[in-house]
């Protein structure tokens, strides 16, 4: 990695690209060019490409992405929490007085829950695709510990029905975006 890099940059394994988030969208920096390229325009609070999903910051932030070992692709699993209601908890350990903390949390039986979409980005062409991961209504999606460092062609995820009675292990071909149930 280049020396003295800002903490909010995520570098590709070969250090030829770096990614950062600004106002919930992704920006690409090429090592040969100092002009950032905006990769996304649909990021917003509670539906962000940034790790700072709940804040409206005017500062550059760390992106919620993972690079493949070959530096040819990276992915972002986005969680849409815009319609989910707020939940509150009292932080009794806060100093000097307890504080009320707010976060998004879907309660059992509520209509709206978190939804997910998986994006694959190709920095060489500045293109990206949205992978079709939908199968169950209101499904939960998690990335499984994939070895993108040594096997950059395969990304694994699980999808689970809201009732938790069905679950699939799936493989994504990162070159095409095709999904295969394992």
List PLM regions with ranges:
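Short alpha-helical segments and helix-capping/turn motifs at coil-helix boundaries
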Residues: 4, 11-14, 58-63, 102-105, ...
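Predominantly five- to eight-bladed beta-propeller fold
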Residues: 39-64, 76-130
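Beta-strand C-termini and the immediately following turn/loop, strongest in propeller blades
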Residues: 15-25, 30, 63-66, 75-81, ...
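Short loop/turn segments that connect beta-strands within beta-propeller blades
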Residues: 31-34, 122-126, 174-177
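A conserved hydrophobic secondary-structure block that centers on an alpha-helix together
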Residues: 1-46, 53, 136-138, 153, ...
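Hydrophobic beta-strand positions in blades of beta-propellers and related beta-sheet-rich domains
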Residues: 26, 36, 74, 118-120, ...
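Long hydrophobic segments that form regular secondary structure
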Residues: 127-131, 135-161, 175-176
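Conserved positions at the start
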Residues: 5-8, 62, 96, 141-143
